[in-house]
Amino acid sequence: MSDFIPSQAISRTRAGQEHYVSDIDETGLGAVDAVADESAPASMWGEAWKNLRKRPLFWIAAVIIVIAVLISAFPQLFTSVKPDYCELSHFLGKPEAGHPFGYTFQGCDIYARVIYGARASVSVGVLTTICVVLIGATLGSIAGFLGGWIDAVISRVTDIFFAVPLLLAAIVFMQMFKQYRNIWMVILVLSLFGWTQIARITRGSVMSVKNEEFVTAAKATGASRWRILLSHIIPNSMAPIIVYATVALGSFIVAEASLSFMGIGLPTTDVSWGADISQARLNLREAPMVLFYPAMALALTVLSFITMGDAVREALDPKAKK
């Protein structure tokens, strides 16, 4: 009898030759899958989230943005005073209980006006950003994917609109249609001239992604051009669009405040940080704090969106991780 060999099994052929066959690995399939999952590379967004979680500025900006959005959506939760309730007896009154920022020259509560002023500014920024992303991303995707004369036409139209400064065009149009001054007119004007950069970024990103191997594989499976564009190219081109949109949102808030500051933005019946800053500048020496609070709210909100955009860009940019 041959000796027992635990690690091998002996088999004989008809010629009498011995062959040694190793034992079957009895490692469970679940354990193999677990190891494979742990060793699998994380997705781009997963790596970006891991990077963002380590950035204190990202969390500070995120908290400020969440607070600004909540204030603009539910201002009545943060103050019980109406922004248009004014009493001349409170002329430049000092801060007191329930009125932590004091009063304006007309006796209005500064804190209430800062709270309600967030609604107009943040709403214009968010809605304008949504509009320019829809317009710019659509045109940029079509131009970058189809190419040819369609790309040439869209690119030339984009260059024409890009050559016109956003704020200057907004001033001209708001003056031309001043009888229709409202929040929707401001959003329309800013969207009409603010989509060009998004279109150029999307076009470049789509042209880069459409040459990737997974797009070639999708074509080999017989997928239609529009299915490839919507299911494969656009989802993988979103990173630079999201980064720019976050930064642009802050820019649109500044644009609205600038128009209201000049008296050609929102109507005087609407509360706006820009309009309050414009009124407070007339008596800056006598009461600087009347200007300080709306200006600080505007600066913090805009800076938070810009910081958020920079943090996301660095998290998604492989060169920034080195």
Regions found by a protein language model. Give the residues of each.
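Generic hydrophobic transmembrane alpha-helix motif, especially the helices
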Residues: 100, 110, 134-136, 144-145, ...
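Residue-level hotspots within pore-lining transmembrane alpha-helices
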Residues: 119, 161, 165, 177, ...
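Gly/Trp-centered helix-boundary motif
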Residues: 1-137, 141-142, 149, 163, ...
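Glycine-rich helix-loop "coupling/hinge" segments at transmembrane-helix boundaries
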Residues: 162, 173-177, 190, 206, ...
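Short helix-capping/hinge motifs at transmembrane helix termini and TM-loop junctions
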Residues: 75-83, 144-148, 173-179, 193, ...
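Short alpha-helical transmembrane interface motifs in multi-pass membrane proteins
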Residues: 30-31, 120-124, 139, 154-157, ...
